[in-house]
C-alpha cells in the first residue's frame, strides 16, 4: 500500500501546486490532514529491490515472504506543509500560501486526518532504506525543472 503518490509525470498534487504557486497570488491549502508524500521513483526502486530479493529467495528456498506491505517516504506533513515545500524548492516566492481547515473544501468523501503508513514491516523484511519526503521532493522538482 502507498499514499500521496507524485512524480515528474502525469497529473498529481506536486505538479499542480508547482503551477498554482507560480501563477496565483494566494492559495489556501488544508493543514488538518496529515500523511506522507510518496515519490514514485522511490517506490519503483523499492519494488525493484523486492523483486530482486524475490528472485534470489525463490531460487534458493522455493519460498518468499508474502503479505501486505506499506511504503511511503519517511516523515509526516500536512497538505499545507507539502505545498510550502513545493513552492520553496520550486523557487516560488510570490504566492501567499495560507493554511485552512478541510471543512473549507467540502467533499462527498470523508478524508482521514492522519493517514501515515507504518513502514516497519517492509523495512525489516527487505532491508529497504526509505528517504525522507523532503529529500525526495527536492529531487523530483529538480528533475521536473531540468526536463522542461
Regions found by a protein language model. Give the residues of each.
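Mid/C-terminal beta-alpha module of Rossmann-like enzyme folds, strongest
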Residues: 46, 53-108
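Residue-level signal for the nucleotide or nucleotide-sugar donor/cofactor binding architecture
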Residues: 35-38, 77, 117, 128-131
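Residues that recognize and position ribonucleotide moieties
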Residues: 27, 36, 75, 98, ...
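Amphipathic terminal alpha-helices
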Residues: 133-148
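A hydrophobic C-terminal alpha-helical subdomain
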Residues: 103-123
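NAD(P)-dependent short-chain dehydrogenase/reductase
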Residues: 1-35, 40-49
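A general structural signal for well-ordered alpha-helical segments in protein cores
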Residues: 13-14, 40, 44, 79-83, ...
